[in-house]
Each structure stands twice: as structure tokens, then as C-alpha cells.
Amino acid sequence: MLARYFRNLYQRTMSEAYGLAIDTISGSLEQEGNVLDCGAHNGKMFATLSEKNGINKERYFGIEWDQGLVKEATEKGLNVIQGDLNKGLPYPDEEFKCVFALSLLEHLINPCRYLKECYRVLQDDGLLVILTPNISTYFTAFLILLGKMPSSGPQPDSDTLIKKEEIFKVSSESLQPDTESDTPIHRHFIVFSYRVLRDYLESIGFNEVKGYGFGLYPFPNFLQPLLEKIDPYHCHQMVFVAYKSKSNSK
């Protein structure tokens, strides 16, 4: 019963967070300009964006670590390349109108370097959209008081330990830990707090940085919309929308 309760909380949280992020990305593409999908998987976001605002393949670019997923994307005719986002973005300055990373930042070893690269490749008045978990939650504090590790990460390089520490499995049953592989896709390395991520985005030149919180656990779903507005700082997931201003361009 309790596991189902938290699973419902999680599913609602992710649905709302992704919904806002996708609507924001889609809205930014109503004007001319290209979009960069970081952690593009097999290009699945292209279908969503194309359906929402009719973006064509020529405006969609993606970068993905997994070569098999890159192959799937290119077979669809999408411009998705293989690359390691810890090592910079292989694109020229001011190339994109919008750059987005959904559930990606926590998987990087060098997330601050990555965010600087996002700033570099964005056009003036370009938009960055980030969706990532928040380490500074009441639920995390509760786990630490119990002597356990934060469920949001960082995570150790042991699948057995991660499964042992997991109180409830709220994600899909098909999503299994892969931390012991040579190329872990699901492992969380660095997890920001709401205030730290907001302040860092501002420090590297972004302005109009707006953050949103989703999922203030353990409160029930019917209270979430109100609580998320009152206290976005301690929600389970956070979405940040940030503009590269002409006046702040470095």
C-alpha cells in the first residue's frame, strides 16, 4: 500500500515536470532557430516536438552517449551524433535557439562544465531548459537521519547496494541499476539543490532564471500543486528555464 502511494506520487511528479519542460521547449521553437537535445536517446523527443509545433528534422539536433541509440535515431533520418557530454559540446558558438537536458544533469561527472557549454552554444536570447532531481528534499533528509543514502544520488558503483538501499521502487520495473557496467546510463553522480543550481546558472551569465519544483514528498497528490508553489526549494524534481541575454553574453 505504501509503495503504491509513493509510486503514484512519483508518477504524477514526473508527468507534471516533463509536461512543463516540453511545453516550454515547444514554445521556444515557434520562432526560427535550431534545438539541441542533450541525452537524445533514439531521438524520441523529436516526435513530441514535431507533433506539438511542427518542427522539421532540419532544426532538430541531438547528442547521445549510447551508440546503439544513435543508430536508431539516424535510421529515422535524425541528426543525432554520439558524444560524451562531460567533454564539451561539438558545436560552434551561438548555434542554437534552445538547448535542453531532461533527466540528464545528474548523470554527468562534469555538470558545471556542461552548463557552461550550453551557454556557449546558445544564441543571444536563447533558452536553456533543465529537468533534474533535487538533493535538498525533506525525503532525503529523512533517509539520511535513518542512516541511509539519498535516493536521488549520488549513487555508489554497486548494483547490489543500490537495490538494498531502495525503500520503494517507484520507477519502471524494467529500469534496473547498471552502475557496475563500463558505460552506466542510469547512475546518478552529482545532484544539485534548487538554490545552488539556480545561483550557478546566474553566475555563468544566464538571466531570467526561473525554477519550478515538483513533488513535495510525502504529502498527497491533491496538495501538490499548492505546496509546489509555496516551497519549490525542497521538491523532488526541479525544472529550470534560463535565458542567455545579449547584455550578459561573455
Enumerate the predicted regions with their spans:
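S-adenosyl-L-methionine-dependent methyltransferase catalytic module, highlighting the catalytic core
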Residues: 109-117, 127-245
